[in-house]
Amino acid sequence: MNQRKRKKAARHLVTAALLGDAPRVRALLRAGADPDHADGDGTTPLYQASVQGDAETARLLLAAGARPDTESGRGSEGTPLCAAACWGYTGTVRVLLAGGADPNLPEDHGTGWTPLEWADRGPHPETAAVLVAAGAVRRVPSP
């Protein structure tokens, strides 16, 4: 697949992830779309799937090599795990953790919160419990 076609496929991949169109995501990945390629706003397919709570699409993207800890939106949107934890998408959180997401990684350019802080503020106790079981640690606030 040439560079132009790869870019086009990657744009379609972000849209398919947003829409929760797992069959389309699967087809685009088979056609060679880069699972980490962000759209013009810097949004990654994995972030889109995570913020929608689409565990199936997240699983497909991770299996295709998407990096679970990449911040989306050039850092302004945060990580896929923070996005899923924020909305209490426990199934997606489990998929991301199984795919290697760091349960203690704070957003760098966003709020600076960890996935557990997002889940606690939800409040999403089931999601928080899954994160703690995966090794997430509650940070002590600075004075």
Name each model-derived stretch.
Residues 1-15, 99, 118-143:
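Ankyrin-repeat-protein effector appendages
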Residues 2-40:
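N-terminal segments that cap or nucleate solenoid repeat domains
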Residues 6-15, 38-44, 71-80, 106-114, ...:
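Ankyrin-repeat boundary/"N-cap" motif
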Residues 15-20, 48-54, 83-89, 118-124:
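Ankyrin repeat A-helix N-terminal signature
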Residues 21-29, 54-63, 89-98, 124-133:
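Ankyrin repeat structural motif
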Residues 48-59, 63, 69-74, 78, ...:
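Alpha-helical adaptor scaffolds
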Residues 72, 78, 85, 90-98, ...:
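Short, solvent-exposed interaction modules
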